Swiss-Prot record:
The gene is CD4. CDD domains: CD4_CD (cd22570), IgV_3_CD4 (cd07695). InterPro entries: CD4, CD4-extracel, Ig-like_dom, Ig-like_dom_sf, Ig-like_fold, Ig_C2-set, Ig_sub, Ig_sub2. One of its GO terms (molecular function) is MHC class II protein complex binding. This is T-cell surface glycoprotein CD4. Pfam families: C2-set, CD4-extracel, ig, Tcell_CD4_C. Residues 26-396 are extracellular. Residues 26-125 form the Ig-like V-type domain.
Length: 458
């Protein structure tokens, strides 16, 4: 009987030797479609030893034979590899490149009579449409996942917008702050994998802008895009609605090709000038009240449905003095909250109204400021100098001129007077001479009728 004990021990040892390799607990690894993943497998001893990687169908993927890496007939043969430099450290990981959704499987590493199972789940996250979208359009993200999985997805935009869901996520009405890199996290079996998706929202940096100018100043309109593209082709137009006009009209049309701007048509009044390079830039030679109003610039990009829009407003200020009235006026779209003021510099005299015109009757002399303000912040300022209302002193040169004119008039008048007097005297002398002659003729008269009265008939 004592001889039977060692024999039983021998059988037990033999059975243990013939047992299959012990399987370790399964690990879960998440991978991204098109990316590279490394499945780890470590031996207890830091030395080079034999190992094999197989798929769930027990088909060999790769392994070691002597000191060389060998590959089996699997579909991963051209994309699987191992780090030979780490074999001496007991690390026998398998690297899979250019991951595909169908690579999702359970992979088995056999080393030192033990098996390590690694479950690989490959996910893909893509945008259903182009990643270059116009402002206001919708973005849809679709998750590709292996059969049998139930992942959840959470995405965050550059502007802080959060969306979450299952295999489909939708973002309606994209805004310009949504442009940039979106970070999406896919979760499965308490594991996560992160995706980065670049979304470009095609829009101008500002939806609306207002330019404040004094009458006569040059006006600059700028329309910088909120995105950068190597090639940008399209066409655009600026429509303008002047405050004084009954209808809007097209001020300018242009073409855009490879970031070069060419003008197609421009009005003669006003005659805008346009820059030839991006960003889009327009110059109005003078700010006049008849131009104050609102405009809408549209840009239609090639191969895109829809247009980019930016609204621009022009507010014009005028300060005038007419007789005894000082007036400050503005034209163009202004908020009812804006305040228009007339203020005498270095004095407390101020007239303010939430209106488009203010005035002062009989203003004091000095420098007056016309101010358009929003909650104390000055948006536009124009200065006008008021002169005293009393007559200004006559200059010496004016006195000389006036004296000369008066002397000339006096001399002319005296000349005329003496000429008339002299002529009158001459005519009077002639008249007296004529009277004397007539009297002389009367004394010597021997008319026949006189003799008839004094003589008797014979």
């Amino acid at each position: 009987m004592n001889r039977g004990i060692p024999f039983r021990h021998l059988l037990l040892v033999l059975q243990l030797a013939l047992l299959p390799a012990v399987t370790q607990g399964k690990k879960v690894v998440l991978g991204k479609k098109g990316d590279t993943v490394e499945l780890t497998c470590n031996a207890s001893q830091k030395k080079n030893t034999q190992f094999h990687w197989k798929n769930s169908n027990q088909i060999k993927i790769l392994g070691i034979q002597g000191s060389f890496l060998t590959k089996g007939p699997s579909k991963l043969s051209d994309r699987a590899d191992s780090r030979k430099s780490l074999w001496d450290q007991g690390c026998f990981s398998m690297i899979i490149k250019n991951l595909k959704i169908e690579d999702s499987d359970t992979y088995i590493c056999e080393v030192e009579n033990k098996k390590e199972e690694v479950e690989l789940l490959v996910f893909g996250l893509t945008a259903n449409s182009d990643t270059h979208l116009l402002e206001g359009q919708s973005l849809t993200l679709t998750l590709e996942s292996p059969p049998g999985s139930s992942p959840s997805v959470k995405c965050r935009s550059p502007g802080g917008k959060n969306i979450q869901g299952g295999r489909t996520l939708s973002v309606p009405q994209l805004e310009r702050q949504d442009s940039g890199t979106w970070t999406c996290t896919v979760s499965q079996d308490q594991k996560t994998v992160e995706f980065k998706i670049d979304i470009v929202v095609l829009a101008f940096q500002k939806a609306s802008s207002t330019v404040y100018k004094k009458e006569g100043e040059q006006v600059e309109f700028s329309f910088p895009p909120a995105f950068t593209l190597e090639k940008l082709t399209g066409s655009g137009e600026l429509w303008w609605q002047a405050e004084r006009a009954s209808s809007s009209k097209s001020w300018i049309t242009f073409d855009l090709k490879n970031k070069e701007v060419s003008v197609k048509r421009v009005t003669q009044d006003p005659k805008l000038q346009m820059g030839k390079k991006l960003p889009l830039h327009l110059t109005l030679p003078q700010a006049l009240p008849q131009y104050a109003g609102s405009g809408n610039l549209t840009l239609a990009l090639e191969a895109k449905t829809g247009k980019l829009h930016q609204e621009v407003n022009l507010v014009v200020m005028r300060a005038t003095q007419f007789q005894e009235n000082l007036t400050c006026e503005v034209w163009g779209p202004t908020s009812p909250k804006l305040t228009l003021s007339l203020k005498l510099e270095n004095k407390g005299t101020t007239v303010s109204k939430q209106a488009k015109a203010v005035w002062v009757l009989n203003p004091e002399a000095g420098m007056w400021q016309c101010l358009l303000s929003d909650s104390g912040q000055v948006l536009l300022e124009s200065n006008i100098k008021v002169v005293p209302t009393w007559p200004t002193p006559v200059q010496p040169m004016a006195l000389i001129v006036l004296g000369g004119v008066a002397g000339l008039l006096l001399f002319t008048g005296l000349g005329i007077f003496f000429c008339v007097r002299c002529r009158h005297r001459r005519r009077q002398a002639e008249r007296m001479s004529q009277i004397k002659r007539l009297l002389s003729e009367k004394k010597t008269c021997q008319c026949p009728h006189r003799f008839q009265k004094t003589c008797s008939p014979i």
